[in-house]
Amino acid sequence: MAPEENAGTELLLQGFERRFLAVRTLRSFPWQSLEAKLRDSSDSELLRDILQKTVRHPVCVKHPPSVKYAWCFLSELIKKHEAVHTEPLDKLYEVLTETLMAKESTQGHRSYLLSSGGSVTLSKSTAIISHGTTGLVTWDAALYLAEWAIENPAAFINRTVLELGSGAGLTGLAICKMCRPRAYIFSDPHSRVLEQLRGNVLLNGLSLEADITGNLDSPRVTVAQLDWDVAMVHQLSAFQPDVVIAADVLYCPEAIVSLVGVLQRLAACREHKRAPEVYVAFTVRNPETCQLFTTELGRDGIRWEAEAHHDQKLFPYGEHLEMAMLNLTL
């Protein structure tokens, strides 16, 4: 195989691997590239390699996605194979049969591969939005912020980090594993989200602060219930963060006002210390929402600067989405 062709195959396999483990929508997979390669070769080795990178991946075997998702993926893979090959590939049908026989769970897993060779795995409800909260969903801006953090570890090394609206915990878990913070505080207002957050922290080999058996080389990890509208200075003063982060929390005008308010109170808690650095990442869905955010910041005397887009694309998320991140000075 020519070097260029080999590189193309590796990229294709990586595309399937990262999307499948992260349980991305099937339409986001590089199916056209796969079909083109299958037409150029009568060999089924590529399909076997895809199985090894997806349903047979060690991370997937340990932390599988929902049975329904795996079944839909394999069905689509079989369709692509049958469209260009007359001979069936027994291995595909064997794996599909195994999947159909597996017991479905109310929890599925999404895994994200890290540049260190490790991974972050989230155990999540198989429902897209559960119990009236979107906090159980991993939004694309959380992936974008995690990528930026991994590329800029100096912002977090040996520092106390407070995350507002942690949701499923992807960003914080990636920072804890890759950026060596001294302490990390996950926060969210919803009790069901907090319950799942605690589970995800433990699932990824981290210990919560009350666990005296925890790894001393790991950051001190806390999961805190924090409602921006009711949190007073005395509660916030316990956190004393050096860095505050948030991802995809600008979903309505009320949330923007609440966010700016809690940031102001966090700054007031630092007394004679320097105010925390703040990074807010979001998907630009509505320019008016972004404008409202910067207007509210200006009204409260908070300066902001847009962070340059980072280079690495480590996690799979919408390729055509516009992402932004602001660095705020309180």
Swiss-Prot record:
- A Gene Ontology cellular-component term: protein-containing complex
What is the top-level taxon of the source organism?
Eukaryota
Return any one Pfam family short name. Answer: Methyltransf_16
Q: What is its EC number?
A: 2.1.1.-
Q: Name one GO biological process term.
A: methylation
Q: Sorted alphabetically, which Gene3D superfamilies does this protein's record hold? A: Vaccinia Virus protein VP39
Q: What Gene Ontology molecular function terms does this protein carry?
A: methyltransferase activity; protein-lysine N-methyltransferase activity
Q: Does the keyword Manganese apply?
A: no
Q: Which residues form a coiled coil?
A: none
Q: Which UniProt keywords apply?
A: Methyltransferase, S-adenosyl-L-methionine, Transferase
Q: Which residues bind S-adenosyl-L-methionine?
A: 139, 165-167, 228, 247
Tell me which family the UniProt entry assigns to this protein.
Belongs to the class I-like SAM-binding methyltransferase superfamily. EEF2KMT family.
Entry protein name: Putative protein N-methyltransferase FAM86B1
* Originating organism: Homo sapiens
